[in-house]
Amino acid sequence: MAGAGTLPGRAAAEARRRGWRVAAFAFEDAPGLAEAADEFIPSSITDIQAVLVGLAAHRVQAAVFVGKFWKSSAFSKYDQADAAGLGLAQGGLSDAALSQMVVATLAGMSIEVLDQREFLAPWLLPAGTLGARAPVAAEWDEIREGFRLAGRLAADGVGQTVVRARGVTVALEAAEGTDETIRRGGRLAGPGAVVVKAVAASHDYRFDIPTVGAATLEAMREGGATALAVPAGRVLLLDRDEVVRLADQAGIAVVSVDDAG
């Protein structure tokens, strides 16, 4: 079940390498997916019935949701009758309500929804410093406080990213996503901001896998941010070589931290 980006193609290739037969239902543009899958099925989130018929026709036994799904634009096309038919009338369009609806619908077809890490583990960022520079003492102070705040933010289901500078929290992530939060924080703080991304202990990796990549570093460079910290083993790193190049070029410290919460 493929959203936008390169992750669906990577997951499909890894699944096939491990002996799975892959039927890719593509809801967004996912470069490389058609070549990586055994079957490629263009799909629309506004035509759920066709997707369910396709799942049955391909005798799907397990599903993995990978990539970016544009929930706000897609589900705005549903009317109240559609929402009620999908079981959303009570739960609304929150991530939790959508996840519960999907799991229940697929369970009724004897389809298990798998953790994305099943096929994306090779790209999880291990503990350590990435690139030439480690954080300095002042940046570590911001990182420790950032993890405390971002952990609470993530646990409440609000967002995962905090931007701090000179002892002050300047931006918290909500619906806009990590990169836009970084840009907003950079505009408010000016050069020298520290970015921290946390993951809730109860995070459901079946439907979302926190990710950083070259776009994250570009957003940091635009605003003059100087350090990025993420929890070890819980966040995907895309475009590793490009991330290292950008970090070293801009003097940005990138660190993955054990016991970050």
Region annotations inferred by a language model:
Residues F27-V53, A57-H58, K77-G87, E180-G261:
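Feature captures the catalytic cores and cofactor-binding loops of soluble hydro-lyases/lyases
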Residues A2, T6-R10, S43-A50, H58, ...:
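Conserved active-site and cofactor/substrate-binding residues in soluble primary-metabolism enzymes
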Residues M1-F27:
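N-terminal basic/disordered segments at the start of proteins
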Residues A4-L7, K68-K71, V235:
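Gly/Ser/Thr-rich loops at beta-strand to alpha-helix junctions
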Residues I45, Q61, F65-S73, P210:
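N-terminal glycine-rich "phosphate-gripper" loop used for MgATP/nucleotide binding
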Residues M1, A15, Q116-L217:
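Conserved mixed alpha/beta catalytic, RNA-binding, or beta-rich assembly cores of soluble enzyme
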Residues Y78-A134:
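Hydrophobic alpha-helical segments and helix pairs
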